[in-house]
Regions:
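Residue-level detection of the helix-turn-helix DNA-binding "recognition helix"
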Residues: 70-71
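Short, flexible active-site-proximal loops enriched in glycine and acidic residues
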Residues: 55-56, 94-96
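DNA major-groove recognition helix of helix-turn-helix/homeodomain DNA-binding modules
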Residues: 76-94
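Short alpha-helical DNA-recognition segment
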Residues: 47-67
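Short glycine-/small-residue-rich flexible loop motifs, especially phosphate/cofactor-binding loops
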Residues: 43, 52, 81
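N-terminal flexible/basic segments that precede or flank functional cores
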Residues: 1-44
Length: 96
């Protein structure tokens, strides 16, 4: 990873620690209607908070969390709910 990419990752991680920023980020990705992009965004939010800490707060094993949020992951709604709760967010539904 080059220095520019590292700075971007660090900047994104810092922004995603703010629940308002993280929620806006996830909402923007949801609007893309791309499940793979949503999985990546959820992984980025969890990474910003520290995967080990998110796993602990979500009462999930670290390997389970990494697998669920991996590129080929397919997390259950229960796992998504736990991860969101662990980072200070919640799932909600609004009219389309």
């Amino acid at each position: 990873m080059n220095a520019r990419d590292k700075r971007y990752d660090e900047s994104l991680d810092a922004a995603l620690l703010d629940p308002v920023e993280a929620a806006a980020y996830l909402e923007a990705v949801i609007e893309m209607d791309d499940p793979a992009a949503l999985l990546l965004a959820l992984r980025q939010v969890a990474k910003a908070h520290g995967m080990a800490e998110v796993a602990r707060r979500a009462d999930l094993g670290e390997k389970t969390l990494f697998k669920a949020l991996s590129e080929n992951g397919n997390p259950t709604i229960a796992t998504v709910h736990k991860v969101l709760h662990a980072v200070g967010l919640r799932l909600s539904v609004t009219p389309a």
